[in-house]
Amino acid sequence: MSVSEIFVELQGFLAAEQDIREEIRKVVQSLEQTAREILTLLQGVHQGAGFQDIPKRCLKAREHFGTVKTHLTSLKTKFPAEQYYRFHEHWRFVLQRLVFLAAFVVYLETETLVTREAVTEILGIEPDREKGFHLDVEDYLSGVLILASELSRLSVNSVTAGDYSRPLHISTFINELDSGFRLLNLKNDSLRKRYDGLKYDVKKVEEVVYDLSIRGFNKETAAACVEK
């Protein structure tokens, strides 16, 4: 094979990979659009009247996750299953965002942390890498940390809306998250930096709870702060 033939062959490989990446980008753009729609819907809970609409907003968000499933099913077909991490950077951030959105819905519904397995059911993907397109553990953890930041904001807006018990519940939840993350030996630099922000979320929520307790807005909050 001549030198020119070698490079022609290599160009064929490069062009084929570029085609794959372009197909992936198209699907990811659709995922990003749906994620924005879900986020816009859920952001309404931060508004005064939004607290009364939480069940309706969560139900609507779950309907949008049906569209997410469709897009992810399409994405799986765009590349060989064994090359997941070769193209992972294309969908990593939107997948983390979708984990956060799923976790936010579950928290608003039950005030509990969604499991990684439950997220994969909501998204229609696999929990284990051996089964193909899956939810990477670090992507799950990143989404959970985004949730913590969102909940710290919600604690402040809850007070504005006159919901004085919600910040206490959020404080308990975020402190449990913090305790959980302390058990992990995080090697990923990006994940470690995001985890560093969790302590500020914890502090922000605790300040809200403390402010409520000293102002005597509700006995539940005051009693909890005294116990601390």
Curated annotation (Swiss-Prot):
| Broadest EC class assigned to this enzyme | hydrolase
- Keyword Cytoplasm among UniProt keywords: yes
Q: Name one GO biological process term.
A: regulatory ncRNA-mediated post-transcriptional gene silencing
Q: Which residues carry this modification: N6-acetyllysine?
A: K187, K199
Question: Which residues does the annotated region (Leucine-zipper) include?
Answer: 177-198
The molecular function terms of the Gene Ontology recorded here are: DNA binding; endonuclease activity; identical protein binding; mRNA binding; RNA binding; sequence-specific DNA binding; single-stranded DNA binding
Judging by the UniProt lineage, the source's domain of life is Eukaryota
Cellular compartment(s): Cytoplasm; Nucleus
Q: What does this protein do?
A: DNA-binding protein that specifically recognizes consensus sequences at the breakpoint junctions in chromosomal translocations, mostly involving immunoglobulin (Ig)/T-cell receptor gene segments. Seems to recognize single-stranded DNA ends generated by staggered breaks occurring at recombination hot spots. Exhibits both single-stranded and double-stranded endoribonuclease activity. May act as an activator of RNA-induced silencing complex (RISC) by facilitating endonucleolytic cleavage of the siRNA passenger strand.
Q: What is this protein called?
A: Translin
